[in-house]
Regions:
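Acceptor/aglycone-binding surface of glycosyltransferases and processive sugar-polymer synthases
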Residues: 3-23, 27-29, 39-116, 142-159
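Hydrophobic helical membrane-anchoring modules
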Residues: 88, 112-175
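A generic structural signal for short, solvent-exposed coil/turn residues
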Residues: 1, 83, 130-132
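The conserved acidic donor/metal-binding loop of glycosyltransferases
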Residues: 32-36
Length: 175
């Protein structure tokens, strides 16, 4: 699946979910394209779906934070807290782009964000649908030779916060 033009992370995820539904996929795995994650760890994210009937497995970068740049650590922790305000989630790393999804998750998850807010929105949708979410510790490589996201951390954070506010407003509309 490839868009001719970069339409955003959420748009790419939306295309993947649509393709997975149309293909009747049993499991899909998402991995950010910035080179931070190790594809050889994909089996770690698939195993809980197959053996424990988990619906979503999130790669957890926070069990080993010593390598994470301080600005990322602060930003991710902040976004984790905001995401957990929208829906009760027992997840340490809500912003990880290394995940696996079961067939049930593929069918039930709904999201509208075309940008980076999709990661939070997907977990919020999963919680609303009572899907079982777990985490697996993963290895992260932060020095990827400039391949990491070029998005400004402040605009990235703002985009995610706006997406979460939309989800909170849908859950608790003004009367």
């Amino acid at each position: 699946i490839k868009h001719q033009k970069n339409l955003g992370k959420g748009a790419a995820l939306k295309s993947l979910f649509e393709f997975a539904k149309a293909s009747n996929a049993d499991i899909i795995v998402t991995i950010d394209a910035d080179g931070q994650f190790i594809p050889k760890e994909i089996p770690k994210l698939i195993k809980p779906i197959i053996e424990e009937n988990v619906n979503i497995v999130v790669g957890n970068r926070f069990d080993d934070e010593k390598e994470m740049p301080k600005y990322r650590k602060i930003g991710n922790k902040f976004l984790d807290r905001i995401t957990k305000l929208a829906e009760e989630l027992n997840i340490k790393d809500t912003q990880s782009g290394f995940r696996s999804y079961s067939k049930i998750a593929i069918e039930k998850i709904e999201f509208t964000s075309t940008g980076f807010g999709a990661d939070s929105e997907i977990l919020i949708s999963a919680a609303k649908n009572n899907l079982k979410i777990s985490e697996e510790k993963i290895t992260v490589i932060y020095n990827t030779g400039g391949r990491t996201s070029t998005k400004n951390p402040i605009s990235h954070t703002s985009e995610v916060i706006l997406s979460i506010i939309e989800q909170i407003a849908l859950k608790h509309p003004l009367k």
